[in-house]
C-alpha cells in the first residue's frame, strides 16, 4: 500500500497536529505500508522543495508569494493551486494507491482536484472543521464568513471517497450534514504508551529552579488559545490563595493568549504565584508533567470544544497524573468522571477551585484514579490500536470498480 499524506504542516514544526501525523506515519510504516509526505505552503520557507527531517522525507510546497498574497479569497485560491500542482508532481513520481488529505479543507480541495485528474481515490481526514477553527480565532459563529466556510467544508466532505476523523463529536456533525454514516470512520487521538510511561518523581533541581518547592502545583501544558479557558484557571487560583491554600500554577507552552494571561495574572495580584515556563522541546515534556500535582483543562464551552477532543489529557493520563477538566463534549469523550478524572462546570472559577479542593480531600482515591487513567489509554487509546482502523478505510477505497 502506497499512500501520499498531504499535510498543512509537519516536523520540524512542533504542534499537536505534527505530533499526531508522526504517530500515524510511524504506525503505518510498522504495518508495512509505504508512506510519502507532502506539506502545503503553511510549512513556511524551506531550504529545498524536498527535505529529510529525522529520517522522514517530505515534499514541500513553497509559499506562493505572488501579487495575490494576503488578498482574501484570492490568496487561498493561489495556495490551493500550488498544492494541487505539487501533488500531481509527487503522484506521478510515486504512483500511490491513494491520497490521504489531512485538514484543513484548504489542503483537501486540491487533493480532491488532483485525485480526480489522476484517477486516484481520496481519503479526507477531518481533525477540526474549518468554520469552527475560524470561530475559535475570532470569526463570528453563524456569520456570513462562517457559513461560507461551512459550505465549502461540506462540499469537500461530499466529494471524498472516504472520511476519517478524530472523535465521535466530529463524526456526528459530519453525518448530520447528509454524509452517509458508513463513509465516516473515527481514528481517535491516542498516545505513545511506551514513550509516556507511568509518572516518576519530580526533578528536584527543576522544581527548585521554577520556585515550586513546598506548594501544590496546578498545571497546564499546551497552546494558549482563548478557548482553552486559562483565564478561568487564574481566577480559580486567586480564590484558592485567598482561602489560604499553598498553591501555584505552572503554565507550559505559549500562543496568542500569552501576553493577555500575564496581564491578567498581574491584574489579579497573583503574578508571583503563576510560573510561565514558555515553550519546551517535546522530549522535555514528561519532566514537566512530573512537576504537576493536578493537570487542569478548563476549556470553554463552544461548538469547537463541544465537538473536538483534545490530545493533551491523554498524555497526562498515560503519565498517571490527576486531572480536572471542564464538563464539555470534547472532555466527556475522554474522561470518565470519578473513574479517570474530575469534571467541573465550564467557565466557572469557583467550580474549578471546588473540584480541586474536593480531589485534595480524598488522597485515598488518587492511586485508583491514576491507575484507571493509565489503563484507559493502554487499552483504548494507543496509537497501534487507533491507526489499525485505517486498514478497512484504505481497503474500501482502493478496491477496483469503486465508482459507478
What spans do the regions from the language model cover?
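N-terminal subdomain of nucleotide-sugar transferases
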Residues: 1-62, 402
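Acidic donor-binding loop of glycosyltransferase active sites
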Residues: 94-98, 161, 273, 289-306, ...
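Carbohydrate-associated surface elements
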Residues: 169, 190
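Nucleotide-activated donor-binding/catalytic signature segment of Leloir-type glycosyltransferases, i.e.
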Residues: 259-284
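Short hydrophobic beta-strand element within catalytic cores of glycosyltransferases
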Residues: 297, 315-318, 322-325, 335
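Conserved acidic donor-binding segment of nucleotide-sugar-dependent glycosyltransferases
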Residues: 337-338, 342-349, 358-364
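A short, well-ordered alpha-helix in the C-terminal region of glycosyltransferases
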Residues: 351, 358, 365-380, 389-392
Amino acid at each position: 500500500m502506497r499512500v501520499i499524506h498531504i499535510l498543512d504542516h509537519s516536523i520540524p514544526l512542533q504542534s499537536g497536529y505534527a505530533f499526531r501525523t508522526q504517530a500515524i506515519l510511524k504506525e503505518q510504516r510498522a504495518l508495512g505500508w509505504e508512506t510519502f509526505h507532502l506539506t502545503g505552503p503553511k510549512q513556511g520557507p524551506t531550504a529545498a522543495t524536498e527535505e529529510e527531517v529525522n529520517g522522514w522525507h517530505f515534499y514541500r510546497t513553497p509559499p506562493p508569494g505572488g501579487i495575490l498574497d494576503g488578498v482574501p479569497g484570492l490568496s487561498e485560491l493561489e495556495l490551493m493551486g500550488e498544492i494541487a500542482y505539487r501533488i500531481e508532481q509527487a503522484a506521478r513520481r510515486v504512483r500511490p494507491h491513494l491520497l490521504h488529505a489531512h485538514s484543513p479543507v484548504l489542503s483537501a480541495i486540491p487533493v480532491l482536484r488532483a485525485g480526480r485528474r489522476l484517477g486516484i481515490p481520496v481519503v479526507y481526514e477531518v481533525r477540526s472543521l474549518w468554520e469552527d477553527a475560524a470561530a475559535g480565532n475570532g470569526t463570528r459563529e453563524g456569520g456570513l464568513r462562517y457559513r461560507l466556510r461551512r459550505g465549502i467544508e461540506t462540499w469537500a466532505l461530499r466529494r471524498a471517497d472516504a472520511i476519517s476523523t478524530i472523535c465521535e463529536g466530529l463524526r456526528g456533525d459530519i453525518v448530520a450534514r447528509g454524509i452517509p454514516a458508513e463513509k465516516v470512520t473515527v481514528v481517535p487521538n491516542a498516545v505513545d504508551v511506551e514513550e509516556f510511561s507511568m509518572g516518576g518523581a519530580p526533578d528536584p533541581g527543576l522544581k527548585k529552579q521554577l520556585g515550586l518547592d513546598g506548594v501544590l502545583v496546578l498545571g497546564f501544558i499546551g497552546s494558549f488559545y482563548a478557548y482553552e479557558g486559562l483565564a478561568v484557571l487564574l481566577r480559580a487560583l486567586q480564590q484558592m490563595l485567598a482561602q489560604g491554600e499553598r498553591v501555584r500554577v505552572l503554565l507550559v507552552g505559549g500562543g496568542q493568549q500569552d501576553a493577555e494571561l500575564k496581564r491578567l495574572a498581574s491584574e489579579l495580584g497573583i503574578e508571583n504565584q503563576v510560573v510561565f515556563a514558555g515553550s519546551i522541546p517535546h522530549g522535555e515534556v514528561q519532566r514537566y508533567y512530573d512537576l504537576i500535582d493536578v493537570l487542569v483543562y478548563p476549556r470553554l464551552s463552544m461548538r469547537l470544544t463541544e465537538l473536538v477532543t483534545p490530545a493533551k489529557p491523554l498524555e497526562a493520563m498515560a503519565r498517571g497524573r490527576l486531572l480536572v477538566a471542564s464538563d464539555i463534549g470534547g472532555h466527556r469523550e475522554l474522561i470518565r468522571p470519578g473513574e479517570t478524572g474530575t469534571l467541573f462546570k465550564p467557565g466557572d472559577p469557583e467550580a474549578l477551585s471546588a473540584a480541586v479542593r474536593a480531589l485534595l480531600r480524598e488522597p485515598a482515591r488518587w492511586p485508583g484514579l491514576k491507575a484507571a487513567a493509565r489503563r484507559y489509554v493502554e487499552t483504548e487509546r494507543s496509537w497501534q490500536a487507533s491507526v489499525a482502523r485505517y486498514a478497512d478505510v484504505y481497503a474500501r477505497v482502493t478496491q477496483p470498480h469503486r465508482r459507478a
